Amino acid sequence: MAELIISASDIEGAIEDYVSSFTADSEREEIGTVIDAGDGIAHVEGLPSVMTQELLEFPGGVLGVALNLDEHSVGAVILGEFEKIEEGQQVKRTGEVLSVPVGDAFLGRVINPLGQPIDGQGDIESDTRRALELQAPSVVQRQGVSEPLQTGIKAIDSQTPIGRGQRQLIIGDRKTGKTAVAVDTILNQRKAWETGDPKQQVRCVYVAIGQKGTTIASVKRALEEGGAMEYTTIVAAPASDAAGFKWLAPYTGSAIGQHWMYDGKHVLIVFDDLSKQADAYRAISLLLRRPPGREAFPGDVFYLHSRLLERCAKLSDELGGGSMTGLPIIETKANDISAFIPTNVISITDGQCFLESDLFNQGVRPAINVGVSVSRVGGAAQIKAMKEVAGSLRLELSQYRELESFAAFASDLDAASKAQLDRGARLVELLKQPQYTPYSVEDQVVAIFLGTKGHLDSVPVEDVSRFEQEVLEHVKASHDDILQEIRETKKLSESTEEKLTNVINDFKKGFSASDGSSVVVNEADAEAMDEADVEKESVKVRKPAPKK
């Protein structure tokens, strides 16, 4: 039997080798404790190294976001069910900031602000994530707005046009058709999507903030019936969700849209509506005991919206030339656009479409008030054909509104004023448009041409809509080359204008008004007043004599 010899030096060497190669499996981890919780807010102590906007993990997998970094505690917003969070529970740091998965797999889906599907159609696979808080493109990374984004709504595309990369505010009282304008704009992108051309296709993101569940469901149904869900993502934070979800939802939609924008694609994002996001952020800030300011909003509520809307841009060609167009919606009270949040967002955006409840109740839908609505940069993106036919439209409607109020107190009006009133009434009727019926740009040009060139002056007001529809059907059926030229060249040449005028005059001969009368003007019986004189006529207001 061999003798076992133990060498002290061998044992010492083996121990030294093991110690030098040993790595501990344990990790240093900060664990905090909930000191109080309620109303979707939790205060946590024991996390001295936590970052602002860092994700925290509560028991049960519930997540929270660290917002307030106080000396001895952290104020966190709970994302999800907060009823089970109690005092004394442990909280862990994740070391991550808020991010969401992004990609084409989200098209046609409904998700919550954390990027999780809520439509019952299974999980969404995505390898790419994008942080919610990212810096907006800098000045050198942008280029000017030059491409039109057609809404399909005559009143908007003719007077307050929108360009790709623009922020156009839709503002008005509740129940004035704000969501309808946004949904119609999404529906109008279907033809561009069907072309398969990435330069024409527009991916859409609809962010529902604080809306009723039935409203979100009806929007989804309308998009499905219009064939628009295949290029649309819905981010839903309904009224039943916690304030944290309503606060984050716009940033989630923006992150999804930015992913496509930086990939050289075009995006349209609708925020419906930012008033409710501001209300949710106010509730969070007050619960975190931040100092309140005007209307009890926190001091950084302007930054809340500015850093969101500044992400909408038209990127430079070096970055791919992608764009993200924003349609933020703001709800006013009693048509007061001078309140805190409306004035903030008006100053951030590139224009606004003001929807008025009085016009809506009069049956003017979309109920856009031309006098207050404006597009500051979209004019550069408007096609030449629309510029030509709609050049005088805004002025004529403004003069009509002025004359209309004046005529209510005046019994006698001169011929020019009567002609302006008659023309204005027909233009208002022409711009009316049913919901879910977007117009192609060439159809809009022909329709506006009817009004501004005087072809509707002999048509009774009640027959304007029928006359417009029948003219468009006639042109499509027998003179489609006119529409094709407008669609391809984006211009209305003199020869095309002359041809269109002849087509309309010939059509009038076979059109009968609802009372059976003809709409063909007999030139011999017409009043000796040309169109230029009618346009030049204006209302003169007598000023009071100066005080002595």
UniProtKB/Swiss-Prot annotation:
Bilayer topology annotation: Peripheral membrane protein
Q: Which keywords appear in this protein's UniProt record, sorted alphabetically?
A: ATP synthesis, ATP-binding, Cell membrane, CF(1), Hydrogen ion transport, Ion transport, Membrane, Nucleotide-binding, Translocase, Transport
Region feature (Disordered): 526-548
Return the Gene3D superfamilies for the record: 2.40.30.20, ATP synthase alpha/beta chain, C-terminal domain, P-loop containing nucleotide triphosphate hydrolases
Q: In its keyword annotation, does this UniProt entry include Ribosomal protein?
A: no
Question: Where this protein primarily resides, as one coarse class?
Answer: membrane
Q: Where is this site: Required for activity?
A: 373
In alphabetical order, the GO MF annotations are:
ADP binding; ATP binding; proton-transporting ATP synthase activity, rotational mechanism
Q: Which reaction does it catalyse?
A: ATP + H2O + 4 H(+)(in) = ADP + phosphate + 5 H(+)(out)
A GO cellular component annotated for this chain's UniProt record is: plasma membrane
Database matches in HAMAP family: ATP_synth_alpha_bact (MF_01346)
Which PANTHER family would you find in this protein's record? ATP SYNTHASE SUBUNIT ALPHA, MITOCHONDRIAL
According to its UniProt entry, the function of this protein is described as:
Produces ATP from ADP in the presence of a proton gradient across the membrane. The alpha chain is a regulatory subunit.
Protein name (Swiss-Prot/TrEMBL): ATP synthase subunit alpha
Species in which this protein is naturally found: Mycolicibacterium gilvum (strain PYR-GCK) (Mycobacterium gilvum (strain PYR-GCK))
Annotated gene? atpA
